[in-house]
Swiss-Prot record:
Catalytic reaction equation(s): hydrogenselenide + ATP + H2O = selenophosphate + AMP + phosphate + 2 H(+)
Protein known as: Selenide, water dikinase
Name of the gene encoding the protein in the UniProt record: selD
Assembly with partners or alone: Homodimer.
Protein species of origin: Methanococcus maripaludis (strain DSM 14266 / JCM 13030 / NBRC 101832 / S2 / LL)
Leader sequence segment: none
Free-text cofactor note: Binds 1 Mg(2+) ion per monomer.
GO CC, any one term: cytoplasm
Cofactors required: Mg(2+)
Active site: U7
Similarity comment: Belongs to the selenophosphate synthase 1 family. Class I subfamily.
Residues the entry annotates as binding ATP: K10, L36, G37, D38, D55, D78, G126, H127, T128
Length: 335
């Protein structure tokens, strides 16, 4: 029904910049602590940080309940990527084809709401339209302390980058859409294909709130902030989102490791995806944390003790450059 699935349907970042250029001025954003260019907008009101974001996308799986969970995971992630763990509610946007049975749409909503409940929040309203193809997402509002806000702009020279989920779900989900007539082109045993699909669903429905809470737990134990900047890895790939961090922090980032779901490099090559060049689109990807080097081992240990993936994927190597690049001998680490 659709040709672009999940976060792969996002408008490319360069086109997005051109779209909003000249429309929203700096004066328009004078009351916003964080405006365009970050994971979410932040307004400070009476000492409280109000975090607003919206994410809507096309289906990435056939199962409507799972699609709802994935959409909720992806929509809420931008609030968590700003360092805020409390979401006060979400307004769900739903596009329904006229021929789509109501029970299918209800399953999408149920998946979205169940994910919200598991993360101590809820659907509080929304908007539904008739549309030629299904759409689901939401406008999410988080609240927290101003000092807890993390943006893409805080990277420091010498920082280490930690990623909390492996990459590759674009290629993994493309595998699930291969029809019987083309199955012979996939030189991966059925058991491995099953692993790829199940691991990908697990990752796309694992909330980034879990990693954020353990980051905050470690900071409380140490009595010090250890994350300088943070984002999540979604439609622009790890290199694209690292580039955003590099530009906003005015630093040079070098990505030395690409942790990927086992089997996805082969699939990416087959499907023409840019996974191994760091530009593969991710849906509901992990947090990318720029942390002080003296705390990286403690952070990795904290994550691993709590069943959160933790990969050291790169570092900040220079000031005043504003560019992200892959190492010449970048490691492809299959998980």
């Amino acid at each position: 029904m659709v040709t672009l699935h999940g976060u792969a349907c996002k408008l490319p970042d360069t086109e997005l910049e051109n779209l909003v250029k000249g429309i929203i001025s700096e004066d328009d954003l004078k009351h916003a602590k964080v405006g365009l260019g970050d994971d979410a907008a932040v307004v400070i009101k009476n000492g409280m940080a109000i975090v607003k974001t919206i994410d809507v996308f096309t289906p990435i799986v056939d199962d409507p309940y799972l699609q709802g969970r994935i959409a909720a995971c992806n929509s809420t992630s931008d609030v968590y990527a700003m360092g805020i763990s409390e979401i006060i509610g979400g307004l769900v946007f739903l596009g329904i084809p006229p021929e789509l049975p109501v029970p299918v749409a209800k399953k999408m909503l149920q998946g979205f709401q169940d994910f919200c409940r598991e993360n101590d929040t809820t659907i509080i309203g929304g908007h539904t339209i008739l549309n030629p193809w299904p759409l689901i997402g939401g406008s999410i509002t988080g609240v927290g302390k101003e000092e807890d806000i993390l943006t893409k702009a805080g990277c420091k020279n010498g920082d280490v980058l930690i990623l909390t989920k492996p990459l590759g779900n674009q290629s993994a989900m493309a595998l699930s859409r291969v029809t019987e007539e083309f199955e012979d082109l996939i030189d991966i045993p059925k058991e491995e294909q099953k692993y790829i699909f199940e691991k990908t669903i697990e990752l796309m429905t694992t909330s980034n709130r879990i990693a954020l809470l353990h980051l905050r737990e470690l900071e409380n134990e140490l009595g010090e902030k250890i994350a300088n900047a943070m984002t999540d890895v979604t439609g622009f790939g790890i290199l694209g989102h690292s580039q955003e961090m590099a530009e906003q922090s005015d630093v040079e980032i070098e990505i030395s490791c690409l942790p990927v779901i086992k089997g996805t490099p082969e699939l990416a090559s087959l499907f023409g995806h840019a996974l191994c060049s760091g530009k593969g689109a991710e849906t509901a990807g992990g947090l990318l944390i720029s942390t002080k080097p003296e705390y990286k081992d403690k952070l990795i240990q904290k994550f691993k003790e709590n069943n959160v993936y933790a990969f050291e994927v790169g570092k900040i190597v220079n000031n005043g450059v504003g560019i992200a690049k892959l190492s010449e001998n970048v490691e492809i680490l299959e998980i």
